Design a protein with these regions (language model features):
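N-terminal pre-triad scaffold of radical SAM enzymes
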Residues: 1, 23, 156-158
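Short secondary-structure boundary/capping segments
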Residues: 38-42, 70, 96-100, 134-139, ...
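A broadly tuned preference for mixed-charge, low-complexity surface segments
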Residues: 72-81, 110, 135-141, 170-178
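Flexible glycine/acidic-rich beta-alpha junction loops that bind and position SAM and/or redox cofactors
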Residues: 33-34, 84, 89-95, 125-133, ...
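Conserved SAM/AdoMet-binding glycine-rich loop
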Residues: 3-121, 125-127
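Short, structured secondary-structure boundary patches
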Residues: 28, 43-47, 139-145, 172-174
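Catalytic cores of alpha/beta
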Residues: 65-70, 128-146
C-alpha cells in the first residue's frame, strides 16, 4: 500500500518538471477504484499536448465510475494494457486466475467503442494445460473483439513462483538461463 496523496504530490513534481509520459505497471491498477479515480482525475485536470498515460488493467473489472472518467479523455492520451492471458477456463483455474470471460469481452468492447483509449490486449502461450487448439480459440476470440494490438507473450517462470507446481504434470520445460 502507498500513501495516495504523497504519490500524487510526487506526480505533480514530475509533471511540473515537464514529464508527460507516464507508464504505470501495477497490474491491479483498476482494482483499487478510489485510487484509480484519483490518479485519472489528477491527469484529467492537467490535460496538455503530449500527455500519454499507460495503465495495466484487470480485464473483467471496469466499474461504471471508472468508465465515466475514462470516457472523458481525448484520443492519444490513454493506453490500456489489458491482461487477458487466456480465455481457457480450465487453464485459468489451474493458474488460480479468477476471470469472468464474458465480462472481459464486454469491457473490451466498451473500451474500444466508448472510449478513446488505445487498447493493447495480452495473451500468454505456454500456460499449464493450454493446448495449441485452446490457445488458437482464445486468440480468435480476442481477435474478433478487434483490440488495437494483441501481444502474445511466452510464459516465463520466476524462481519460487507457484506455477512451478505444474512443471511435472504438464510436461513444462524451461530454459536454465533467466528469464527461464
Amino acid at each position: 500500500a502507498f500513501d495516495l496523496s504523497a504519490f500524487l504530490a510526487e506526480m505533480e513534481v514530475l509533471y511540473q518538471r515537464g514529464a508527460r509520459n507516464f507508464k504505470f505497471v501495477d497490474r491491479t491498477f483498476n482494482l483499487k477504484i478510489a485510487a484509480s479515480l484519483s490518479i485519472l482525475q489528477f491527469f484529467l485536470d492537467r490535460l496538455t499536448d503530449g500527455l500519454f498515460l499507460h495503465f495495466e488493467v484487470v480485464p473483467d473489472h471496469l466499474p461504471d465510475r471508472l468508465k465515466a472518467l475514462i470516457a472523458q479523455f481525448p484520443p492519444g492520451v490513454l493506453q490500456f494494457e489489458v491482461g487477458v492471458q487466456s480465455f481457457n477456463v480450465e487453464v485459468q483455474q489451474r493458474i488460480s486466475r479468477r476471470q469472468d470471460n464474458a465480462k472481459t469481452e464486454v469491457n473490451l468492447r466498451w473500451l474500444l467503442t466508448q472510449s478513446n483509449a488505445h487498447v493493447h490486449a495480452d495473451l500468454i502461450f505456454g500456460l499449464p494445460g493450454e493446448t495449441l487448439e485452446s490457445f488458437a480459440a482464445g486468440f480468435d476470440r480476442l481477435y474478433q473483439l478487434r483490440p488495437h494490438e494483441i501481444q502474445l507473450g511466452l510464459l516465463k517462470r520466476l524462481r519460487g513462483a507457484p506455477i512451478a507446481r505444474h512443471t511435472a504434470d504438464c510436461g513444462m520445460v524451461y530454459d536454465k538461463i533467466p528469464p527461464y
